[in-house]
């Protein structure tokens, strides 16, 4: 059990037999009336996001989630195989569980896998990943009045928007949470 004062991003709550992860929360103290906490919760299994409001100080049941360090090894059909960094056990995760993060996975990449009762729930990548641009069209500088972007396909197959000056073969720093361009990596 946890109080609303214990809320933090990433905390997993158990509501009506389902697991929900806090994506964001905000403590609100209006001028009139009691304080409350506004949360955005993501269903760990389905990925559905809902808004929920709690009165301040309310106790909520939390789920025990074991986050384990692992390393991405390879893809085997529709499964992604990870090796636990502690006991070296291999964990195949289905493509449905990895989801859009597959576009940012490189072999030997350190990740975290969250388990609940021995069942993998979700995967966490490092916030920033370095990827090579596999293909992008040359950018034409003079064809617009403001700075523009263009699509680029990364070595993993992910497609992101990059500035016009990026070329095929450049190494980029990318935010794995939303796929946004962060900058070039100096060689």
From Swiss-Prot:
One of its GO terms (molecular function) is translation elongation factor activity. SMART domains: EFP (SM01185), Elong-fact-P_C (SM00841). SUPFAM superfamilies: Nucleic acid-binding proteins (SSF50249), Translation proteins SH3-like domain (SSF50104). It is found in: Cytoplasm. Its main location: cytoplasm. Pfam families: EFP, EFP_N, Elong-fact-P_C. GO terms for biological process: peptide biosynthetic process. InterPro entries: Elong-fact-P_C, NA-bd_OB-fold, Rib_uL2_dom2, Transl_elong_fac_P/YeiP, Transl_elong_KOW-like, Transl_elong_P/YeiP_cen, Transl_elong_P/YeiP_CS, Transl_elongation_fac_P. Pathway: Protein biosynthesis; polypeptide chain elongation. HAMAP family: EF_P (MF_00141). Belongs to the elongation factor P family. Involved in peptide bond synthesis. Stimulates efficient translation and peptide-bond synthesis on native or reconstituted 70S ribosomes in vitro. Probably functions indirectly by altering the affinity of the ribosome for aminoacyl-tRNA, thus increasing their reactivity as acceptors for peptidyl transferase. This is Elongation factor P. It comes from Mycolicibacterium gilvum (strain PYR-GCK) (Mycobacterium gilvum (strain PYR-GCK)). The gene is efp.
